[in-house]
Amino acid sequence: MLLLLVVIAGGTAIAGSQAPELPDTLPLDMSVWYRRDYARCNGAGRVTIGGNIITIEADHSALKYWQVPTLIGPLPINERLGWIRRCDRPHGSFGTEARKRAEEQQITIRVTDYPYISWRWRIQGTVDDSRTADRAGRILSGGDDFAAKLGIQMLPEGGNDLREIAYVWTRSIPEGTTLVQEAGALFWHFRFYRIVAESGDEYVGQWRTETRNLVEEYKRIWPDEEPGVLMRIFLMTDGDNTGTKATASYADIVLHRALPERLDPDR
């Protein structure tokens, strides 16, 4: 499995203290992704990156690729870190350290500055979702398999508890459905939200364009909060729980200050 890391050993490659003027759009660098595969870099499958497209092929595995976007490109991560070499989850202080580095250089992305996100994706087949969630929309243990998932992790304004919204492509769960996944570790309890952006096999093998209002959906899920800083964007294709193969391509992920005129707001 290929792991692409564009990093600086000390993790301090981005320079400049002057806050850049905010552009109307922020296209993500689609060539810089860090791997998380839940199998210590041994998850079966492969990734292909080129031409502003990343294609993830998961073979009975769960493959995730992520980056920390900033106003001037992905935040470099030190490739010598043990959890990076193991394709593991970020260690406990990573979020705080990454935020501090970006804030010192005034390059953090505020969700309210870029409320819209658009992207294109294509799948080669849907994944069985008959055992994904219960009737209340709670994702069942072993049910979190999706052919394509694009996730956004954010912090609430003035807070440090991570918020996550991910858009997924399902087989039969209706478009527009919001699912929730609950997880816990020691004294912490997490709730991750998945919103069905595409459903069904009609467009398998075809590129689909999506546009979402992050602020609007954040406020719908957390009505008493305001979104703060964008922390991480990830792509995930997985079939480990259902024992299936899944392939998805992702392209042209862009953050927008205003609703893109040439994109369908319902997509």
Regions found by a protein language model. Give the residues of each.
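Extracellular carbohydrate recognition and processing domains
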Residues: 162-221
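Extracellular carbohydrate-recognition regions
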Residues: 14-41, 265-267
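Solvent-exposed strand-to-loop "edge" motifs in beta-rich extracellular domains
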Residues: 120-126, 155, 215
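Extended, low-complexity, turn-rich repeat/linker tracts enriched in Gly/Pro/Ser/Thr and Asp/Glu
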Residues: 123-130, 158, 241-244
